[in-house]
């Protein structure tokens, strides 16, 4: 049953990732990897929020921890695509884009996790 919860969350996370990515790229274009950037930063926020709330509610079924952080957020975010896009920008001589993407992803990712934890703590308070 554990695998089913991960798979269910993962399927929904993958669909959300695809939908959000397409929506962003259709509006902002592909000069910068806006879709992956937005997905990873919002995923960082969601992991901070979800784990803070789930940790405060240990009485919830373990299925929630499998379905949301492991399944949904795990499939929604994409470290490998982030790394690939950073390397491809550098290989194409777009060092400014590569450095900006790398640095802003890390900085805003950490900030988003923290913000998610702050919001999560307010929810459970």
From Swiss-Prot:
Annotated control of activity: Na(+) is not transported, but it plays an essential structural role and its presence is essential for fluoride channel function.
Location(s), subcellular: Cell inner membrane
Keyword Amino-acid biosynthesis applies: no
Catalytic activity entry: fluoride(in) = fluoride(out)
GO MF term set: fluoride channel activity; metal ion binding
GO process annotations (BP): cellular detoxification of fluoride
Membrane topology listed for this record: Multi-pass membrane protein
InterPro entries assigned: FluC (IPR003691)
Keyword Kinase: no
Family: Belongs to the fluoride channel Fluc/FEX (TC 1.A.43) family.
NCBIfam families per UniProt: crcB (TIGR00494)
Function of the molecule: Fluoride-specific ion channel. Important for reducing fluoride concentration in the cell, thus reducing its toxicity.
HAMAP family, A to Z: FluC
Protein name: Fluoride-specific ion channel FluC
Species of origin: Acidobacterium capsulatum (strain ATCC 51196 / DSM 11244 / BCRC 80197 / JCM 7670 / NBRC 15755 / NCIMB 13165 / 161)
Encoding gene (name): fluC
């Amino acid at each position: 049953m554990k695998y089913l919860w991960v798979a269910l969350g993962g399927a929904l996370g993958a669909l959300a990732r695809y939908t959000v990515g397409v929506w962003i790229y259709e509006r902002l274009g592909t000069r910068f990897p806006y879709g992956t950037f937005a997905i990873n930063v919002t995923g960082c926020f969601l992991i901070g929020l979800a784990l803070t709330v789930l940790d405060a509610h240990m009485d919830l079924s373990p299925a929630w921890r499998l379905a949301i952080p492991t399944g949904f957020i795990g499939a929604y975010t994409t470290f490998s695509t982030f790394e690939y896009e950073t390397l491809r920008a550098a290989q194409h001589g777009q060092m400014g884009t590569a450095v900006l993407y790398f640095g802003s992803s890390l900085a805003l990712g950490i900030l988003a996790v923290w913000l998610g934890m702050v919001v999560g703590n307010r929810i459970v308070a």
